[in-house]
Structures are given as structure tokens and as C-alpha cells.
Amino acid sequence: MVQVVEAFGKPHVNVGTIGHVDHGKTTLTAAITKHYGNFVAYDQIDKAPEERKRGITIATAHVEYQTEKRHYAHVDCPGHADYVKNMIVGAAQMDAAILVVSGVDGPMPQTREHILLAKQVGVGYIVVYINKADVSDPDMIGLVEMEVRELLSKYGFPGDEVPVVIGSALKALEDDDGEYGKKSIDKLMERLDDYVEVPPRSVDLPFLLPIEDVFSISGRGTVVTGRIEKGEIKIGDEIEIIGLKATQKTTCTGVEMFKKLLEKGSAGLNVGILLRGTKREEVERGQVLAKPGTITPHRKFKAEVYILKKEEGGRHTPFFANYQPQFYLRTTDVTGSIKLLEGKEMVMPGDNVSIEVELQVPIAMDKGLRFAIREGGRTVGSGVVSEILE
């Protein structure tokens, strides 16, 4: 039996904005909160000081809003190529993505990379918002829409049926009553409600939460945050902290979401979990919290991987056995060594191959876990664990 989680009395969906730098992701996020949530201004979403100076978003901002039908938690993912690493963490928390594409420029390199990443980290649905329509012309917008649909199909999304909304996030933010203003946000919310199915949550599976961040709250102890991937957790539940170092046991002494205390946390929700007697330095991002005995840490596995072509932003040259890139698994990056299987001398950009990987540190994993392969600040491949070796 699969259960749909409710939040605030409505079905709950995790969404987020993806797309090229300066195409309007953060402006759109602000506009949605203005009309459907508690308004969060552009510069609040774009918070950290060093980010605003460069006019690009590095951190992942969390906001919430609701339609008549649903409650949405929304992450504004970084758009700049240098911050794809962070985006992988953001995208991992999305049931659906709002792909923002400028109607003036059309799809750009990061548009492609974000679509690829969305596919790879298991984002189920994409809804497109063609932005800056007020300063583009209808012919250009038609071309942009065609190009975006083709691109989505190329990366495995149903390009022909993906909803496309045309508007201006800035006009919507300025409360403009025209077609491209607030009405485009209404239309976008309608499309999200109608097109994106509320994902069946794995609440009946054993509890698992990949740790994204760790805080120390004076007088209360250590809190870890992240999105519950499977199962549910209640106060008093025993849990294990797995990966990177020896497995530790602890107990959950509190669950909270958006600063509200919950009786329990269930799959799909972004929560903070208070841990009994655990020191801040004993836990780190990249580990997971799980029901005792349900998942184990491993260093060696077999995987099916796709290595990006040069045109997709991948490597320009082949790689050979013992190549050592970074593997992004859930919320962390770990260096690993690649072993090619018999009869394979080298792997060319564009190849789809079976490989064996040996990580430098153990990570909690099971079959079916997806990951990205990165080097020198860029994605060079994607893969899925096909078999655990040890």
C-alpha cells in the first residue's frame, strides 16, 4: 500500500526552478510566493552576500505556497554552471521541476545540463515557463517553445505533452493584469496542479533520510536536515547514522518542518530531526539516517553509466581503467576509481557502459541508486547502481 502524504490538509508536492543563469528562476519564485504564499522578495531568496554581488544564486532557497488543491514546497536551484554541484542536491528534492527559459535567448548550455540532471536524479515531471515574453516577439517565442520541447524529448521527457506557459515573471511581480503578468502565474499553478501527479510516497518502506545539513541548537542538541526519502519517523524511534565512517545508533527526539513541530515526518517532506546524545561533529552531510538494519554502507558496486558527449558539456577525450572522478551520491561527492569490464579498453564520450566502481569511503547505498560523475567542476556522466559488490 502506498500513501500520499498530506501537509496542511492538502496533498504535498516538492517542486523547484531549474534553467540557465539570468533566465528568471529567482524572479519567478518570488512572483509565485507573492500570489500564492507568504511573499518572499527576490533578494531574500538570493540571500547570501557573496551571491548577490555576482548576481547569481548559489544556495538552495526553500519557500512554500499553496493552491486550492495542493501544498507546494519549492526550491530555487542555483543556475550557474559552477554551482551544478549544489543543484544536484536541490534537484534531488524535486517531484517536478519548473524549467525557466528566456523567450529572448532560448535554451542555453545550462538549460540542457539541468534537464539532463533532472532526468538523472529522478525528477518525474517538468513544466516549462517561457519568461521575458514582454520583451520578446511571438515568432521567437514559438521557436523557443519548439526547441525546448525537442530538447526535453531528447533527454527522455515527454516533450510533446509537457505544459508550456508563456509569461513575464517581472510583470507578475509588479502585479500586472495582462496575459503575461499575474495570469501567467495562475496558469502555471493550474498546470502544476493538473499535470503533475502527486507522487506516491514510499511511506510504508523503512525510514531513510539523506543528510543535507547539520546544526547545533543550544540546549536542545544536534539537528540534521534533509528530505525523507522513504518511510516515516516518530519521536522516540531508534535510528542509525550510516556512511563515511562507522555506523552509529541514536534516537529521534523531535521532528520539525518549516519551524512547526510535527508528531511524525513522512516520505517526501523536508524536515529537521533532533538526535539524542549525538554531537555535532559526529554527523555530516552525505551520511543517511535510517531504520536500524535496513541499509548498509558499501564501497564497491557495479553500475550502468552514460558518459556525456563533448557537445553535451562532457569530456573531449576518452578515459581508461583506473580513471578517478568524483561520484555524487544523494547529497555528497566521493572520489572513486573506475574499473572497466573485460574486453573494454577505453570509454569514449557518448558511450553507455557497465563499470565497476570502488569508492574511497563507504556510502549507504542499494541497487537502483542514481548518481552523477563529475570532474573539474562539470558533469561528465550519469549512472545507476546495478549491483552491490562489497
From Swiss-Prot:
Catalysis performed (reactions): GTP + H2O = GDP + phosphate + H(+)
GO MF annotation list: GTP binding; GTPase activity; guanosine tetraphosphate binding; translation elongation factor activity
Pfam family, one: GTP_EFTU
UniProt xrefs under CDD domains: EF_Tu, EFTU_II, EFTU_III
Keywords noted in UniProt: Cytoplasm, Elongation factor, GTP-binding, Hydrolase, Magnesium, Metal-binding, Nucleotide-binding, Protein biosynthesis
Keyword Nucleotide-binding carried by entry: yes
Cellular component GO terms held in the UniProt record: cytoplasm
Family membership noted in the UniProt record: Belongs to the TRAFAC class translation factor GTPase superfamily. Classic translation factor GTPase family. EF-Tu/EF-1A subfamily.
Function per UniProt: GTP hydrolase that promotes the GTP-dependent binding of aminoacyl-tRNA to the A-site of ribosomes during protein biosynthesis.
Protein name: Elongation factor Tu 2
Organism, as annotated: Wolbachia sp. subsp. Brugia malayi (strain TRS)
